[in-house]
């Protein structure tokens, strides 16, 4: 879903060499000096972070561990990510729920206070502007996080519609949380590690839940969510306390939770079958085509009321022409835009994300194929650098998710 490798333009589960980094810098920025830095930048460098340009920021792609080692350690122990390049914001006012429901497909009104959900911002044609995790803090306060590469576009979209909504008497305002940083603690040790740093009982906080609590002396927005398929948390912390909190988390884990970069984050989300905006979802792809119909609330399916509802509800009723699928493939890992063919060699779609799975020890990917050819077990071919390799459609997630839910 989230924090995707938007500016890089393709999955980066492979390790980037210096020549790759220089190419990206030349493509997107005049120099390294143009890049924004999170408050943890010096902390990353001091801990061996290999910094690369991403969505206007200098971010760690990996640390001393290889991407494969970091991926496996997250599954077995835990990982700490700096995701402060993402944009957190709050919507407030008695009409904030009604306002947001004009822009997203979720049943925001149906969320209980202190709970949240993945949703999709849509355009007039039903395409995805961005995906986001939203939380209903109270009936008059919504907290959400949008992707770094979509920040300017998303904020302009929200502001445009907010002006029109307020002009009609709607009560809604917003605040962009630039004063906060965002950490993601993921993996089987996430809960026990964080519990050492707060007096709040986290054992009753389940996947999707939200709290505002004290963690290691800081007032934090805590959401039990993540982008890895593992149990974990996203922690919005005042920026002046972010480095100290990161150090405290690593210390309490006794070295088992490790700093992890964008490379492993990408392989983790791919193994979990999660969309990467800019690859697996774009403005011409609807939530139905992306396999996110489950994120469209039942009430919203009945009532509509969001941008592009006519297109999306018709697809739910009639079925979409294309569908996102999971892929296994032979040969080298498939990359974004690799052609997918049927057994007769006819084009039926393309790969949107792909790479080698550190946990499965095989090539995995996602892509879009014509409806009817989307069923698991369907044999197909994938064209990689001019050569054709055998592949097949498979169910997702590739690696079972381990979200913390009530027994």
Swiss-Prot record:
Catalytic activity, as annotated: N(6)-[(R)-S(8)-aminomethyldihydrolipoyl]-L-lysyl-[protein] + (6S)-5,6,7,8-tetrahydrofolate = N(6)-[(R)-dihydrolipoyl]-L-lysyl-[protein] + (6R)-5,10-methylene-5,6,7,8-tetrahydrofolate + NH4(+)
Q: Which Pfam families match?
A: GCV_T (PF01571), GCV_T_C (PF08669)
Q: Which UniProt keywords apply?
A: Aminotransferase, Mitochondrion, Transferase, Transit peptide
EC numbers for this chain:
2.1.2.10
Q: What class of enzyme is it?
A: transferase
Report the superkingdom from the record.
Eukaryota
Query: Which amino acid positions bind substrate, per UniProt?
Result: 234, 265, 403
Q: Where in the cell is it found?
A: Mitochondrion
Instruction: List the GO molecular function terms.
Output: aminomethyltransferase activity; transaminase activity
For this protein, the record's InterPro entries field holds: GCS_T, GCST_C, GCV_T_N, GcvT/YgfZ/DmdA, GcvT/YgfZ_C, TrmE/GcvT_dom1
Where along the chain is the transit peptide annotated? 1-29
User: From its record, what is one biological process in GO terms?
Assistant: glycine catabolic process
Quote the cellular component terms of the Gene Ontology held in the record: glycine cleavage complex; mitochondrion
What SUPFAM superfamilies does this protein map onto?
Answer: Aminomethyltransferase beta-barrel domain (SSF101790), Folate-binding domain (SSF103025)
Primary location group: mitochondrion
Q: How does it assemble?
A: The glycine cleavage system is composed of four proteins: P, T, L and H.
PANTHER family linked = AMINOMETHYLTRANSFERASE, AMINOMETHYLTRANSFERASE, MITOCHONDRIAL
Query: What is this protein for, i.e. what is its function?
Result: The glycine cleavage system catalyzes the degradation of glycine.
Q: Which family does it belong to?
A: Belongs to the GcvT family.
What is the name listed in the Swiss-Prot or TrEMBL entry for this protein? Aminomethyltransferase, mitochondrial
**What gene is behind this protein?**
GDCST
């Amino acid at each position: 879903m989230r924090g995707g490798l938007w500016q890089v333009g393709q999955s980066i589960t492979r390790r980037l060499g210096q020549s790759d980094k220089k190419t990206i810098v030349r493509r997107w920025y005049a120099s390294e000096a143009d890049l924004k830095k999170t408050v943890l930048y010096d902390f990353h460098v001091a801990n061996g972070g290999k910094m690369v340009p991403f969505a206007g920021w200098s971010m760690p792609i990996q640390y001393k561990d290889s991407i494969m080692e970091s991926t496996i350690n997250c599954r077995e122990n835990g990982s700490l990510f700096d995701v402060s390049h993402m944009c957190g914001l709050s919507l407030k006012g008695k009409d904030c729920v009604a306002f947001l429901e004009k822009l997203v497909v979720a049943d925001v009104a149906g969320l209980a206070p202190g709970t949240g959900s993945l949703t999709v911002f849509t355009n007039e044609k039903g395409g995805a502007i961005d995906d986001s995790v939203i939380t209903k803090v109270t009936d008059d306060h919504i907290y959400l996080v949008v992707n770094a590469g979509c920040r300017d576009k998303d904020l302009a979209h929200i502001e445009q519609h907010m002006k029109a909504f307020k002009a009609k008497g709607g009560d809604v305002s917003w605040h962009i949380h630039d004063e906060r940083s965002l950490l993601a603690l993921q993996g089987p040790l996430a809960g026990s590690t964080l519990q050492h740093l707060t007096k709040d009982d986290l054992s009753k906080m389940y996947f999707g839940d939200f709290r505002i609590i004290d963690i290691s002396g800081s007032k934090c927005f805590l959401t039990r969510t993540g982008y890895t398929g593992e149990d974990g948390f996203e922690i919005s912390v005042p920026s002046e306390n972010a480095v100290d909190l990161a150090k405290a988390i690593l210390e309490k884990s006794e070295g088992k939770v490790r700093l992890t970069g964008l490379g492993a984050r990408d392989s983790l989300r791919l193994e979990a079958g999660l969309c990467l905006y800019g690859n697996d979802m774009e403005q011409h792809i609807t939530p139905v085509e992306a396999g996110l119909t489950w994120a469209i609330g039942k009430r919203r399916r009945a009532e509509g009321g969001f941008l592009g509802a006519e297109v999306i509800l018709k697809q739910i009723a009639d079925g979409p022409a294309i569908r996102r699928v999971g892929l296994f493939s032979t040969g080298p890992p498939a990359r974004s835009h690799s052609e997918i063919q049927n057994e007769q060699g006819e084009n039926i779609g393309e790969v949107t994300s792909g790479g080698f799975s550190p946990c499965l020890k095989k090539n995995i990917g996602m892509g879009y194929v014509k409806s009817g050819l989307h069923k698991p077990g369907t044999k197909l071919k994938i064209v990689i650098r001019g050569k054709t390799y055998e592949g097949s459609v498979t169910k997702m997630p590739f690696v079972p998710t381990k979200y913390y839910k009530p027994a």
